[in-house]
Amino acid sequence: VARLSLNQATIKRATVAEAVEGCVRHGIESIGLWREPVADHGLERTAKLVADAGLRVSSLCRGGFLTAVDNRAALDDNRRAIEEAAALRTDTLVMVVGGVAGDKDLVGARQRVADAIAELSVEAKSAGVTLALEPMHPVFCADRGVLSTLAQALDIAEKHESVGVVVDALHVWWDPDLDAQIVRAGERIASYQVCDWLTPVPADVLLGRGYPGDGDIDLGRLTRHVAATGYAGDVEVEIFNADIWAADFDEVIAEVSRRYHAIVEPAL
């Protein structure tokens, strides 16, 4: 499990301490953290806890939400997120860029994202942090992510040394141009996240993620394409699913490890 990372959202009800302890028990060497539970535990305490446990922090989630016409408060929050990522000794801040603002101006929202990333990239570079733009499935364009394809994320990322992209299986698997865009991304792939797309889709599509192997995504093929770029970073398992959230943390972590070994690791 050297490259397996447990994204904290997979065991959403767990505290930071419980998530770290679970990783250690199951021999998982890396964890993807979220800002809210980190704040609950305390930033410095979390950094020490993770370091003392010998874990890497594969990413911090999340910055972003930059699409408001007046996004000054969001920019300030993202500056704090960059500082938090540096304090946690991760070089990857996942950016969920935000949905369409109230004016329904999708073109304008995308431009505001590009402008904000240009501004934040300077501070990210100085902190040694990569802003990892996460393209999101088009179903989330209205409320979460106006960048729907890897190509759109790369159009912004390629302009800045400190900006990369996230390849999240759930968000990109459907894209007919995906293979070419993964090749294009190359060393700009800052994070690789896996889960599966469940059908039928639940009423809250956000919670439609399953364990690798339970859905419709060819994760072996996708993983081989990502690995072919030379990506050698951690592979996060990130699952939003009400039943998995309600389950015992230890059972979930054990199942994550089993699925990673069976489905993802052989393709790396």
Where are these regions (language model features)?
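Generic recognition of cysteine residues
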Residues: 23, 58-61, 141, 195
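Basic- and aromatic-lined ligand-binding clefts that recognize polyanionic substrates
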Residues: 126-160
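Surface-exposed cleft-lining segments at the edges of enzyme active sites
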Residues: 98-110, 137-144, 209-210
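Structural motif corresponding to the early beta-alpha repeats
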Residues: 29, 33-115, 121, 125-126, ...
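Histidine-acidic metal/acid-base catalytic patches
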Residues: 1-27, 51-53, 83-84, 89-90, ...
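Active-site-proximal loop/turn and secondary-structure-junction residues that shape catalytic pockets
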Residues: 10-12, 35-37, 63-66, 97-101, ...
